[in-house]
Design a protein with these regions (language model features):
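Active-site nucleophile/metal-coordination loop of metallo-enzymes that catalyze phosphate/sulfate
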Residues: 1-47, 54-141
Length: 143
């Protein structure tokens, strides 16, 4: 059985968003990544951010040799949000918010206002697969 990896909120995928937000002059209240800040300080003409969903360190180390391109070019290992679902992690990346702030924890969620379970990324009813045009709210944690 593999070891449970706990999120490190100072070195996680959320901190990529925080660093990019700071770089672009957007509001940010999360920790940034020193290594990424150093790279961005080089004043590149263009910066491209690519997210490989599910590409964690364990599958890389298990399936690739030490001399593989990806292994040789690892700069830093980060953890993911928790839970590390596609919806949760990519929403944190996209909006620079902790999971409790955005509230998108899983692929399918129940929305009481419309009495439906929706697959939020593909905008479909979880049971009928009907496309649903619904403005998904982010969590309101102002209380």
């Amino acid at each position: 059985m593999s070891e449970f990896i706990k999120p490190n909120w100072k070195k996680s995928n959320l901190n990529i968003s925080a660093t990019l937000a700071e770089f672009l002059g957007a509001p940010n209240k999360n920790n940034t990544l020193a290594l990424l800040k150093e790279e961005l300080a080089k004043e590149y003409k263009n910066v491209i951010f690519i997210c490989f969903d599910g590409m964690g360190i364990n599958p890389l180390e298990t399936n690739l040799s030490e001399d593989s391109f990806l292994i040789k070019h690892i700069k830093q290992t980060l953890t993911s949000t928790f839970p590390s679902t596609t919806t949760n992690a990519t929403t944190s990346l996209a909006c620079n918010k902790q999971p409790l702030e955005h509230g998108w924890f899983g692929w399918s969620m129940h929305f009481e206002e419309i009495k439906r379970n929706l697959d939020i990324y593909i905008h479909k009813d979880s049971q009928t697969k009907e496309i649903v045009n619904y403005e998904y709210p982010l969590a309101d944690n102002s209380n």
